[in-house]
A protein has these predicted regions:
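Charged, low-complexity intrinsically disordered regions
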Residues: 1-151
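Conserved pre-motif I regulatory segment
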Residues: 139-143, 147-184
Length: 184
């Protein structure tokens, strides 16, 4: 098939064909990760479990505005939300309560979950804006996508060579009808 242009490729956060270095670069740039934390916070992808993991996501200080306010909440920082997004999971915030029997159980906190879901959508939109901005990255990703993912095209059937002996000569089949017969 013909190569696709960047405008024709939809890239979602969590796409496994995107190299983890790009995800990590997006994370550092978007969340303004301090240089001293960049060594401890890193993105990993396991092809065996098909799971993304952000190592060191809890080492971020609570006074980090990007991680806990702009792209995260007080209950789920931006790195945790990004990890859920990479694994194609909706972020959920639970509270632990004690029931009448004295057993602890987890209950979904709807208000905090809604707030975290809004932050998750903000991160997804930021990624869509960021991924194609750099011309060099754009060129590399378009080439990679076309080589790895854009390799299948629908078959085209041509029945123009088929003849039908014994068919009524008054009936002539159209090209699409012959192609449909070739398909079968």
């Amino acid at each position: 098939p013909k190569d696709l242009d960047a405008s024709e490729i939809e890239v979602r956060l969590g796409a496994t064909w995107i190299d983890k270095e790009y995800i990590q670069q997006f994370m550092y740039e978007t969340f303004n990760t301090p240089f001293y934390l960049q060594r401890s916070i890193e993105v990993n992808y396991s092809s065996f479990t098909a799971e993304w993991q952000i190592k060191g996501k809890s080492s971020v200080s609570y006074n980090d505005v990007a991680a806990y306010t702009t792209y995260g909440t007080s209950r789920a920082n931006a790195y945790k939300i990004l990890e859920d997004s990479l694994n194609l999971r909706d972020v959920r915030i639970y509270d632990t309560i004690e029931d009448a029997d004295g057993k602890e159980r987890r209950v979904l906190n709807a208000k905090e979950t809604t707030l975290a879901a809004q932050k998750q959508q903000t991160i997804r939109e930021a990624f869509k804006d960021w991924i194609w901005k750099d011309p060099e990255r754009r060129q590399t990703l378009v080439r990679q996508y076309n080589e790895e993912m854009n390799s299948t095209r629908p078959r085209e059937y041509n029945g123009s060579h088929i003849t039908f002996g014994g068919m009524n000569p008054a009936i002539t089949l159209r090209e699409h009808q012959k192609s449909a017969i070739a398909h079968v």
